[in-house]
C-alpha cells in the first residue's frame, strides 16, 4: 500500500474489539504503536499466514523530505494473532521529529458469551527523556436491547513514574436506526487539573 496522508497502521491487524467513543480509546490505548499514524507519504505492507498469524510494517515521511538527512520519518512493525474468540497484537514504532521517540504497544481481546474484554498497554521512550507508560481496559456488551453497550477506562496519556496520572472514563450505547444509520449517545469524564465531563451523540452512515 502506498498513499498520501495514510496511516501506517491501516494495514495492521490489531486486536482491539472495543467500540471507542473518545479518540484516545480508539486503539485500546496504543495509538502510537498499534495505531501508528502518518507523517505524509506512506508505504506499508502486510502478510497473513495460515492459522491466524499476521505481520505488517511500513514507513512514512514528509512529502518534501522522504528519508532525507533531516529526520522526520515514522517506522512501524506489527505482529498479531487472531482466533475466533481471542486475539493479541504487538507493535513497535520509531517516530522521528523534534524529539525522536520509540514506542512498544500490546493490545488484546477475549470474547465471553455475554461480553468482550479488550485491553492495551503502551510504553513511550523519548531520546533523553523518561520512559512513560499508559493503559486501557474496556468491556463491550454486544446484545443490550437493540444495540451494543461499551464502557472503558484509560490513562489520559502516557505518564512517567514521577508524573501525576489522570484517567479518562467513558460509556456509550450504539444502536441502528436502519440499515444505513447508527446513533451512539455517550458520556465521558477526563481527569486533569480541572476535570472535563461531556455528553454527545454521534451519528454514522453507511452506504
Where are these regions (language model features)?
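Structural signature of outer-membrane beta-barrel domains
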Residues: 3-9, 62-64, 95-97, 124-126, ...
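Conserved active-site loop/cleft motifs that coordinate metal ions or position small ligands
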Residues: 150-152, 181-187
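Outer-membrane beta-barrel "beta-signal"
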Residues: 175, 195-207
